[in-house]
């Protein structure tokens, strides 16, 4: 009988992960090296730190240089700029504020910033800011916006191209403002709210918005056109692209997001679930708060094509998921992130409890990152 049911399982094709031989540490290291080494060569990446979460624990791999001039190697402690992966932290912090009853995604934006008196802001909700559907806020906050007065002027003068909740246009100016307003009821500045409500409870002790003096020795240089660069400060940078961290903290971040049931803090646990909830469908992709999800299984080319800037940064029509769907374990959950000198990628599949973090000190095309990550995770199944 036992043999018969085993045969049935094989015939039904449900045996893949249940009956797959576990990948050994040595095999995993080989898969990572055989994927990352040619990628770095092809994309001229000076240094990379990779974490693979497999069988309940992170495995770390480091390659190349954190600082070319000083000949400093990348280590698991090296700090990288996350770029837009910072948005996943903003999404979870916003989710935590919702869980505490401080804000609601259905609230009007003007409730948290009454000075926004422009007619165009009527009918724009916190949800629209958080998910890039306010009507066409720009990718970047303009450089001339340097203080709160010019920030207010910028948002007052902005005119939407589309009705709220109809079109997704990826924008730092959208989720950045969501993050800034979401913490207002807490009475804390953004950095303090992030530290006390998200970073500390998850023991992410080497994750920073502003890298302290004592940690500067670990901060990698980014490289752009052969020059060493780091991100410049800007309005709403903390919320949209300002987090710096190491591969160990990022692995812990992925594990917390992949298994929120293991998070002790009740509002944070709920905040993580809200960030991976599905608010809009855009083609085969679902928009969360910071996180983006596709139904698993998904073909590599679907994920790769969706990550291309031509698609990711294009205005696309949205279909509302109403009510929002709670997190789906059979999902490819991911986010890309770049600054002038850094390029990162994070992806995980909650159902399989596998995930990957790829941090690099140069910005290179998203499709190459996604392809490499997919290849490595595919080898674990």
From Swiss-Prot:
Molecular-function GO terms, alphabetical:
beta-lactamase activity
Pfam families in alphabetical order: Beta-lactamase
One GO cellular component this record assigns the protein to is:
outer membrane-bounded periplasmic space
Additional information = The sequence shown is that of strain P99. The class C beta-lactamase family has a specific amino-acid numbering system known as SANC, for structural alignment-based numbering of class C beta-lactamases, or else the simpler name structural position. A multiple sequence alignment was used to derive a consensus sequence and then the consensus was numbered taking into account insertions and deletions. This allows use of identical numbers, e.g. for active site residues, despite differences in protein length.
Q: Which residues form the active site?
A: 84, 170
Q: Which gene encodes it?
A: ampC
Alphabetically sorted, this entry's keywords are: Antibiotic resistance, Hydrolase, Periplasm, Signal
Give me the disulphide-bonded residues: none
Q: Where does this polypeptide localize?
A: Periplasm
Q: What is this protein called?
A: Beta-lactamase
EC number(s) from the headed UniProt entry: 3.5.2.6
């Amino acid at each position: 009988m036992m043999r018969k049911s085993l045969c049935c399982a094989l015939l039904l094709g449900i045996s893949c992960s249940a009956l797959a031989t576990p990948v050994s540490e040595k095999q995993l290291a080989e898969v990572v090296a055989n994927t990352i080494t040619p990628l770095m060569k092809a994309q001229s990446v000076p240094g990379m730190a990779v974490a693979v979460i497999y069988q309940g624990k992170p495995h770390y791999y480091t390659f190349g240089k954190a600082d070319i001039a000083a000949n400093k190697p990348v280590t698991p402690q090296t700090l990288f700029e996350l770029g837009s992966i910072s948005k996943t932290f903003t999404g979870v912090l916003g989710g935590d504020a919702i869980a505490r009853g401080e804000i609601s995604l259905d609230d009007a934006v003007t409730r948290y910033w009454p000075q926004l008196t422009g007619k165009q802001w009527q009918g724009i909700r916190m949800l629209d800011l958080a998910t890039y559907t306010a009507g066409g806020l720009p990718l970047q906050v303009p450089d001339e916006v340097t203080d709160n007065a010019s920030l207010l002027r910028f948002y007052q003068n902005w005119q939407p191209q589309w009705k709220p909740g109809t079109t997704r246009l990826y924008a730092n100016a959208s989720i950045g403002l969501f993050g800034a307003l979401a913490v207002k009821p807490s009475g804390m500045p953004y950095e303090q709210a992030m530290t006390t409500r998200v970073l500390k409870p998850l023991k992410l002790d080497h994750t920073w918005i502003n890298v302290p003096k004592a940690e500067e020795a670990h901060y990698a240089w980014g490289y752009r056109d052969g020059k060493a660069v780091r991100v410049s400060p800007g309005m709403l940078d903390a919320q949209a692209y300002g987090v710096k961290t190491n591969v160990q903290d990022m692995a812990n971040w992925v594990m917390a997001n992949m298994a929120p049931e293991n998070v002790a803090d009740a509002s944070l646990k709920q905040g993580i679930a809200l960030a991976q909830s599905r608010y809009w469908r855009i083609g085969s992709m679902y928009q969360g708060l910071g996180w983006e999800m596709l139904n698993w299984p998904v073909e590599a080319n679907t994920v790769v094509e969706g990550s291309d800037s031509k698609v990711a940064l294009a205005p696309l029509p949205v279909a509302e998921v109403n009510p929002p769907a709670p997190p789906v374990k059979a999902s490819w959950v991911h986010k890309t992130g770049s600054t002038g000198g850094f390029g990162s990628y994070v992806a995980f599949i909650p159902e399989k409890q596998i995930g990957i973090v790829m941090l690099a000190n140069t910005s290179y095309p998203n499709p190459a990152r996604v392809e490499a990550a997919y290849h490595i995770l595919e080898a674990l199944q």
